[in-house]
């Protein structure tokens, strides 16, 4: 299997495989955050029912559980396909790091998924069959299981962005885990988990508030709608504030371990001390800018020193730009970051040493391999420009995420004010705006993932394995065919989900 890492794969195969994985991931992420968010709302509603034993809260809980169930099933279906793609389209990746990457996914499948499967059955079919306390526990444990599932998947993703706790074994040609705790509890994983889960709560909260506002527009289910707005807006406001805090921590981590991603997010071509944070700028949306010759984007409006503060926690800290990273630069602590050409040379040394050791078992190659293994992936890079991700996509996706996220803070705060201090049903403009917030919240969430994944290109595993070496040696035509099959399948699934959700929302809660 390892020999495939040394073959040339056509660019068409790489592009179609990337497109297929992106398609599956984007569709999967339409379902997952709503599942995580609705789980919190269900838990709060049923806790109210458990405490006061009022049938009203039971109806509220069961109504949101019904919508949760539809979405949960779709999320499971798309998630299974996503995991299979690692073996079909990315077999070299699976072979190279399967011992490390597979561990969190195995735990997710054995622990979290079975936990969800067990308690979701009790949650749906255990009403009036088990005690109220056990049913409440089942509802919360269903949400906890989904959250634990997200934890292990995000641990795996974080490891790809910041690989720690592993060592390369030249005899097996694979990375092997040396510290499970380093992988599971890396700062990158913790930040990614907290930011992703809080953003999921935001989507669930937005959905609940929007559906409730639709009822108020139709002058239906007024009591349920107002109670749900209080829950949803409360959860949403807390979640947006937490997402802002965890987003700041995530950006700091990116600055430390993925400086090229940060440079692309900011369209920062030439770095320096006391760098400003770009609020808006004119970056061509459809072509890579001439970062080698341009000083900065046109029509740039920026906040002085803010980027340095976010990236280094000091107002005059040094932040490298795209050109600095390519040419090499000096860190604040005085250590030197090699140029891309130096890294490529060292990466090629590592590959040659590995091939020689594999063919001859010459032990004198092992010190050379160990010395240069840090830059192993650079040995596959032909041109420094390959290391610069799409600046327009990263730049605008990041601003979409932050802009809509800021709008959501105001939205939830206004929701709470109107539902507690005013007669919210009288503000028709707000009720309509709430419905519009559903696609905006999804755009913000998907934009965050686009920044995270596009921003680390060309790496499958940061610095260790580029996309071009992680791919399976398969025909581009077969991948293209399955791409369109999946596109049709996922679009149909999404249409079915929306249709069922709309039907159930129009039907409303079922009163006993």
Which stretches of residues belong to each language-model region?
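Polytopic transmembrane helical bundles with strong interfacial aromatic enrichment
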Residues: 2-512
């Amino acid at each position: 299997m390892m020999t495939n890492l040394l073959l040339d794969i056509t660019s068409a195969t790489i592009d179609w495989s990337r497109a297929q994985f992106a398609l599956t991931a984007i569709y999967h992420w339409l379902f997952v955050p709503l599942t995580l968010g609705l789980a919190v709302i269900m838990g709060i509603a049923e806790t109210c029912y458990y405490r006061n034993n009022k049938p009203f809260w039971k109806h509220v809980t069961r109504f949101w559980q019904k919508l949760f169930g539809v979405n949960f099933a779709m999320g499971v279906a798309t998630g299974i396909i996503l995991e299979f793609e690692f073996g079909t389209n990315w077999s070299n990746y699976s072979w190279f790091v399967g011992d490390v990457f597979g561990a969190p996914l195995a735990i997710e499948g054995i622990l979290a998924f079975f936990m969800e499967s067990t308690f979701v059955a009790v949650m749906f079919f255990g009403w009036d069959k088990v005690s109220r306390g056990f049913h409440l526990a089942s509802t919360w444990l269903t949400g906890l299981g989904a959250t634990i599932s997200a934890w292990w998947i995000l641990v795996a993703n974080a490891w790809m962005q910041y690989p720690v706790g592993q060592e390369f074994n030249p005899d097996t040609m694979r990375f092997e885990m040396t510290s499970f705790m380093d992988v599971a509890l890396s700062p990158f994983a913790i930040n990614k988990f907290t930011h992703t889960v809080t953003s999921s709560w935001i989507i669930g909260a937005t959905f609940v508030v929007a559906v409730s506002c639709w009822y108020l527009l139709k002058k239906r289910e007024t009591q349920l709608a107002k109670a749900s707005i209080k829950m949803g807006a409360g959860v949403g406001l807390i979640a947006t504030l937490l997402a802002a805090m965890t987003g700041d921590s995530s950006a700091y981590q990116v600055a430390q371990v993925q400086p090229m991603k940060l440079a692309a997010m900011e369209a920062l071509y030439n770095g320096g001390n006391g760098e400003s944070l770009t609020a808006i700028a004119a970056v061509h949306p459809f072509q890579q800018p001439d970062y080698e010759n341009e000083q900065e984007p046109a029509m740039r409006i920026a906040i002085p020193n803010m980027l340095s503060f976010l990236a280094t926690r000091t107002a005059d800290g040094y932040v490298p730009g795209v050109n600095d990273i390519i040419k090499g630069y000096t860190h604040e602590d005085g250590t030197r970051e090699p140029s891309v050409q130096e890294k490529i040379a060292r990466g090629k040394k590592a590959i040659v040493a590995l091939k020689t050791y594999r063919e001859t078992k010459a032990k004198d190659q092992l010190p050379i391999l160990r010395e240069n293994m840090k830059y192993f992936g650079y040995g596959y890079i032909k041109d420094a420009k390959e290391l610069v991700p799409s600046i327009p996509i990263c730049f605008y996706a990041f601003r979409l995420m932050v802009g809509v996220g800021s709008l959501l803070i105001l939205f939830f705060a206004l929701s709470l004010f109107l539902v507690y201090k005013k007669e919210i049903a009288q503000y028709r403009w707000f009720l309509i705006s709430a419905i519009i917030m559903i696609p905006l919240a999804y755009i913000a969430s998907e934009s965050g993932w686009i920044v995270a994944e596009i921003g680390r290109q060309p790496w499958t595993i940061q610095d260790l394995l580029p996309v071009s070496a992680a791919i399976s040696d398969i025909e581009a035509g077969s991948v293209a065919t399955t791409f369109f099959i999946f596109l049709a399948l996922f679009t149909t699934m999404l249409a079915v989900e929306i249709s069922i959700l709309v039907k159930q929302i129009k039907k409303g809660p079922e009163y006993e």
